[in-house]
Amino acid sequence: MARSPVEPSAGQPAKRAAWLRAELERANYAYYVLDQPDLPDAEYDRLFAELQQIEAEHPDLVTPDSPTQRVGGEVASGFTPVVHDTPMLSLNNGFSDDDVVAFDKRVADGLDKPTDLAGTVTEPVEYACELKFDGLAISLRYENGRFVQASTRGDGTTGEDVTENIRTVRSIPLTLKGKRVPRMLDVRGEVLMFRRDFARLNERQRAAGQREFANPRNAAAGSLRQLDSKITASRPLSFFAYGIGVLDGVEMPDTHSSLLDWYETLGLPVNRERAVVRGAAGLLEFFHSVGARRESLPYDIDGVVYKVNRRDEQDRLGFVSRAPRFALAHKFPAQEALTKLVAIDVQVGRTGAITPVARLEPVFVGGATVTNATLHNEDEVRRKDIRIGDTVIVRRAGDVIPEVVSAVFDRRPADAREFVMPTECPECGSRVERLPDEAIARCTGGLFCPAQRKQALWHFAQRRALDIDGLGEKIIDQLVEQNLVRTPADLFNLGFSTLVELDRFAEKSAQNLIDSLEKAKHTTLARFIYALGIRHVGESTAKDLAKHFGSLDPIMDASIDELLEVNDVGPIVAESIHQFFAEAHNRTVIEQLRAKGKVTWPEGPPAPRAPQGVLAGKTVVLTGTLPTLTREAAKEMLEAAGAKVAGSVSKKTDYVVAGADAGSKLAKAEELGIPVLDEAGMHKLLEGHAR
């Protein structure tokens, strides 16, 4: 980027301001993008101060892309949602060389690359390799070369508007350069903080008596999500571009590597640690080369990213779920450190899972200070023989979730104590149980347990349960945290005056929720059973229970043997149902829900005892037009005999009943060798004469 034209005099404020802006932007580009600073800090500060003074004296000369506009604006009240025109997808992860080899094979197979007789690909795939930064993914929008908006990744579909904060990041150009400037461009990249800048920031935090940041990523995240952009402006954030969303007005580069080269001509910062390689061997060579230099890099990375280089090949491979088939994030092995395990507590999850958690002497590992680490479950503690007082190896799995890998046995003190799983839930005092075939111990408190309360309420309100429209997670959070709701029964005691006091809950929203709660009082037995959130009981099992018993009380009082008579209920499900209703807290909540007619449903007689004939448990498919029976009548007769009537033929089909004009189902049955019956044969089978 060339130096600015001849320096105008101070007597020409408009020209002087334009020259100062150009000179400061040129210096920013040299410093942040080229990493070749050519203007001393003191001189930069002098020119910056002069531009501020001119703009203060001549407000009409202020431009949106002036370097002075990076210092931050008014404090925002919150972040506005932004829907991404092109989703910001996550990447599939690889953790080993084998994962990379498998990825390369999938790509080569997907592109129909030729192979020799030994199965070796003869035309290896070309890949673009980059670093995987440990920062925050951001999308920058430029319109006709001018920066207009920035948004976070969010959930990949919707992020948050952080335009004013991103405007303060000096490495991000407010105006694109070059001749091929598009009408619209979404640049995808990463906001991060260099290690040297992180160290200086923490020095400032210490000097000011403020809390230090644990690692550069946390510092970058905390800086970017400030409501006051002046605070963001004071933080040394950087940016690297690595991807693209929307592009309009110029032709899309035909390779990923040429896209990054083009970005550089636009003045966007692109990391130089990148390469174009071929095949799995090239990928692994890049990975191990970067890994050897990882600690000497000026920023934190947690792996490298591989992308099929050619754009047309990316398009052919497409996407699976929420990730592209043409890319892989190859993560570095987790980092480890030694520390002392001072205690083992248990945490109760939202589904009642009891998880042992190690309390550790603080240790810096994987870029963060770790004081707690998961021990997964009781079996893992026993298998690893981890004891309170041990010196342990701590690892940040995936550089994110700390875990205790093992104890250092030759350092075990004489007074080290074994972990004992509590028999009562620390949150509610309910019994803790662990089924024989499961590794996880669970609190049986269910609807009563505070730790499970939010999840229980959310499940209770779901569309397939009691369908309480308007009762979302954020409302549930407020109701529980303000102690307005302890159990699902409390929902029906909520009044209009209570609801309108909730944060961001207008009168209309309050009335809509009241109406929805009133409507939810009239449900079905199957929906009510499902809404209780009994472990292992989904919609289908809830319907089977309702159909088999007819009313709730027999279900609540049923023995395990009686529950096992229900269609598709096995020992684990029967035990779960029995234990749920054996818990006094759960019965209390159910009685509260039924009391005073709060929640009602039509009840019926129990279903007839399940048939024990030849069709019991068999799968039957109907096809074509039967001589005397409608399809529905035949289905009812078969189901009454204990058969399951399916809609398609598979290897699991036992019989096919075919009438006139039977089509592909009949052909499929003959192909699979499945017995085919006409209507008369079906009647014989129903009567027990056929075998």
From Swiss-Prot:
CDD domains: BRCT_DNA_ligase_like, LIGANc. Its cofactor is Mg(2+); Mn(2+). One of its GO terms (molecular function) is DNA binding. The active site is at K132. One of its GO terms (cellular component) is cytosol. Belongs to the NAD-dependent DNA ligase family. LigA subfamily. Its EC number is 6.5.1.2. It catalyses: NAD(+) + (deoxyribonucleotide)n-3'-hydroxyl + 5'-phospho-(deoxyribonucleotide)m = (deoxyribonucleotide)n+m + AMP + beta-nicotinamide D-nucleotide. It is an enzyme of class 6 (ligase). GO terms for biological process: DNA repair; DNA replication. Keywords: DNA damage, DNA repair, DNA replication, Ligase, Magnesium, Manganese, Metal-binding, NAD, Zinc. Zn(2+) binds at C425, C428, C443, C449. NAD(+) binds at D41, A42, E43, Y44, D45, S90, L91, E130, R153, E190, K307, K331. It comes from the Bacteria. DNA ligase that catalyzes the formation of phosphodiester linkages between 5'-phosphoryl and 3'-hydroxyl groups in double-stranded DNA using NAD as a coenzyme and as the energy source for the reaction. It is essential for DNA replication and repair of damaged DNA. This is DNA ligase. Residues 610-691 form the BRCT domain.
